[in-house]
Amino acid sequence: MAGVLGTSTLAQVGFIVRDIEESKKVFAEFLGVEVPPTWDGGEYEVTGTTYLGQPAPEANCLMAFFNIAPGLQIELIQPNGKPSAWQMYLDEYGEGMHHLAFPVNDTEKKVISCEAFGMPLLRRGLYGNAGGEYAYFDARKQLKCFIETLETYPEK
C-alpha cells in the first residue's frame, strides 16, 4: 500500500518554540549532544515562500536541527511574528510538536494527493539554499498535526 505520500519514511519531527537559543540548550542537554547552530529560513528572493496560496515575503524563522538517528532530525522553529504556518501554530497552541516531515519526490503530485486526502496546502517554498522544496499541509483533522514534505533536488 503506497499511502498518500508514497512513503512511510519519517525524516523529521518539528517543534515550534518561542526562544530558539534556550530551546536548543535544553534539547541538547536532554539528548546529550552539542548545541547546534541556528539557521535563518532564507531570503524570499530564493525561497519564493507562499502562505495560504499568497506570496509571503515577510514570513521567516530561525531553525536548529538535531540529527538523532540516520535520516531522522528534530527541528526547532522560532517564527518571526509574521503570518505563516509556524506563527499560526504558536498563536493558536503555543509551543509544541508542529509537524512530521517525509522525504518525497515530485512535490507537485504530493500536493494533489494531500489535498485529495483533505489536507490543504498551507505553506510552500524552496529551501534557503534553493537545493530543494518543502510544503506544509494541515492534517490536524486527520493526523492531529501538520505534515511537511521535503524534496531535495539532485546536486548538479
What kind of region is each of these model predictions?
Residues W86:
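Zn2+-dependent peptidoglycan hydrolase active-site motif and core
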Residues L5, I16-P70, K109-A135, K141, ...:
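Core segments of cupin and vicinal oxygen chelate
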Residues G71-P79:
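Ordered, amphipathic secondary-structure segments that act as subunit-interaction surfaces
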Residues G3-V4, D91:
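Short consensus segments that form the blades of beta-propeller domains
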Residues K141-I147:
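Short, charged/polar, Gly/Pro-enriched secondary-structure boundary elements
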Residues L10-R18, N60, A64-L72, Y89-D106:
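Vicinal oxygen chelate
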